[in-house]
Each structure stands twice: as structure tokens, then as C-alpha cells.
Amino acid sequence: PEQAVQQASTEPDSQQAAAEAQAAVTEEKRKAYEQATAALDAYLKAQSQKYQDPARHCSLDFTCPLPSVGRISTYFGEPDAVYNKPHTGADMPAASGTLIYAVADGVVSAASARPSYGNCVQIDHGTADDGSSYATLYAHMSSFCVSAGQTVHKGDVIGYVGNTGDVRGANGGYHLHLELRINGTRTDPLQYIPH
């Protein structure tokens, strides 16, 4: 009986230790995620500046980036299940290899593999009549078929749906992660882009 009491009293301690260890791992992952995000943002900003042309006009006449979108699995701003950070784009589930289209005319400012976004493409669409610059980012592609500096037109195929990079949780399957940046700031893409 005394041994059973002693064993029962140590169970909460071991549960607390396990919870603390899990919290430490989660915090470490969160910090790594934030560092990777900062590095990605710096890279994308530098690439955008490299290919930015103030004379390029963005008409804001966007098209859907996929042949069809059945649903949105994660919306812009929803808390991330792992890091509890706001989601930076909209996730559109689709079959592996589904064509991904440029939503508008522009110049590819980045086409590379990144740790968090996997194979991704950023397109700078230019400046709209309101003076704001627009860019879109397409992530987790299985592969892309454009290169930095390439001019693309609305509806051109730029890559294929995949699940590369840091995909997890409910969004761990094949999907397009789509971001819209206005003057470099992430904005809800579904406010501008048909789906």
C-alpha cells in the first residue's frame, strides 16, 4: 500500500516533467519557425526589390490560381495549430500535380526551394492605380516551371501542386499556399483573388 501511494505521488511529477519538456520543444520549434520566417521574408524582399519596376502596372484583374477550388482548408489569419501564429495566406487543397496559374501579369522575382515554403514562386505584379505594389507567393509546389526574371502572363502555368516544405497538421496534404503582399505586407488573398 505504501509503495502504491508513493508511485501515485510521483506520477504527477513525471506528467509535469513531460509537459515541461514538450513545452520546451514547442518553444524551440516556434523560435526556429520565426527565424526561418524572418530569413524568408528578407530573401523575398530582396528579390522583389531586384525585379521591381515602378512602371509595371497592376490592373488588379486577378484570376483563380487553380483550375478549380473546392474549399479553403486554412484561411488567412487563422491561428496555426503548431506555433499559434496567424496563418499568412490561404491554403487550397488540390490533387498532387494540379496546375498552378499566375493570377495576373508580372515578373517572377523568386523561384526556389525554401525550408518552410518548399518549392515556391513569387511574382511581382507591379503598381496599381492607388500607388500600392502587389506581389503573390505560391508555396509547397511539387515543382515550378518558371525562373527569376521571367515575365509571366495571367493564366500562365507556373508550377504544380505539392506538399514540399513545412507542411503539417490538417494542411499536411497536397495544397497550394497562396499569399498576397501589398507594399510588402501580407494581406488576405481571398479579398482580391477569385477562388
Show where each model-derived region lies.
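Active-site-proximal beta-strand/loop segments in catalytic clefts of secreted hydrolases
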Residues: 75-77, 103-104, 111-112, 124-126, ...
